[in-house]
């Protein structure tokens, strides 16, 4: 699949601007977190920056502009951002001017792209648009309703949990490295959505309507994947896992998509793979990313 020259230029401009505007915390602020190396992200500065933020060593202003954060969670470019903006216009255009969505988008001072280039009424972080489109997709497909509970594995800065709170009033149990969980809860509190999030240690192990994961489950080694299956996945009536196992499985000793699906089915989950649907964006297709769901 070849990309249009215009798309390549557009995303290249985003990368150049991002490199110029990204911030870097002072070394004294990036406290060592001591997290267990269980994933791709646990080995990167991202985990330490989240630990510092969770402990009050970093302010929220500029958090999403920090290079260590952008490398992990602000990865959606403007071409994909425009794709998700189109989905939002189809599924709920009023949300593009909603003040709660604006508060989530501007929290942490992310690099935002002009609305006329994204097809939105104002500037947005392209990553915000993906989270908003995902939350709308989950609701319109019946996975979440008002007040639903959801487990999110790999919570990032808390953006999707915040969107699910805004769109569906959902309560998210965040599952990640401890310092990342605490960082995400701080974000939810600062955006007025704190009652919609809880730490993984607060979950009682009961069944839940949905477990979701944007890439994170497929960026774990097989041992941790098995732990997450037994602890979380098998308790969910439905699951949505955006998978890039084709990129990471062999590198970190994780399962391939076929192996994951076989494990899920052996555990009683009617899981299948989709390589095309309304939520997978242009870069997902380009990189061979798919969706595992049951």
Language-model features: where?
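Conserved beta-strand signature within the Rossmann-like core of class I S-adenosyl-L-methionine
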Residues: 236-248
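Conserved alpha-helix/loop element of class I SAM-dependent methyltransferases that forms part
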Residues: 128-146
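Conserved SAM-binding loop of SAM-dependent methyltransferases across substrates and taxa
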Residues: 157-169
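Conserved class I S-adenosyl-L-methionine
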Residues: 146-156
């Amino acid at each position: 699949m070849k990309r249009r020259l215009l798309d390549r230029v557009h995303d290249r401009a985003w990368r150049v601007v991002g490199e110029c505007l990204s911030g870097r915390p002072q070394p004294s602020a990036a406290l060592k977190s001591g997290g267990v190396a269980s994933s791709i992200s646990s080995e990167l500065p991202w985990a330490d920056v989240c630990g510092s933020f969770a402990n009050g060593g970093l302010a929220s202003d500029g958090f999403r502009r920090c290079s260590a954060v952008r490398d992990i969670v602000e990865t959606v470019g403007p071409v994909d951002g425009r794709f998700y903006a189109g989905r939002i216009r189809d599924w709920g255009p009023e949300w593009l001017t909603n003040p709660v969505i604006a508060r989530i988008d501007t929290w942490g001072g992310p690099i935002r792209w002009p609305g006329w280039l994204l097809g939105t009424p104002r500037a947005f972080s392209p990553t915000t648009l993906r989270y908003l489109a995902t939350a709308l997709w989950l609701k319109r497909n019946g996975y979440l309703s008002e007040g639903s509970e959801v487990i999110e594995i790999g919570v990032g800065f808390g953006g999707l949990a915040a969107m699910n709170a805004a769109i569906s009033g959902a309560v998210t149990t965040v599952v990640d490295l401890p310092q990342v969980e605490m960082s995400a809860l701080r974000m939810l509190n600062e955006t007025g959505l704190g009652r919609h999030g809880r730490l993984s240690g607060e979950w009682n192990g009961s069944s839940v309507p949905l477990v979701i994961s944007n890439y994170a489950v497929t960026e774990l080694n097989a041992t941790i994947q098995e732990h997450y299956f037994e602890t979380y996945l098998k308790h969910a009536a439905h699951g949505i896992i955006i998978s890039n196992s084709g990129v990471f499985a062999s590198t970190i000793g994780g399962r391939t998509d076929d192996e994951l699906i076989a494990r899920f089915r052996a555990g009683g989950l009617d899981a299948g793979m989709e390589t095309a649907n309304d939520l997978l964006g242009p870069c997902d297709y380009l990189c061979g990313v798919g969706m595992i769901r049951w």
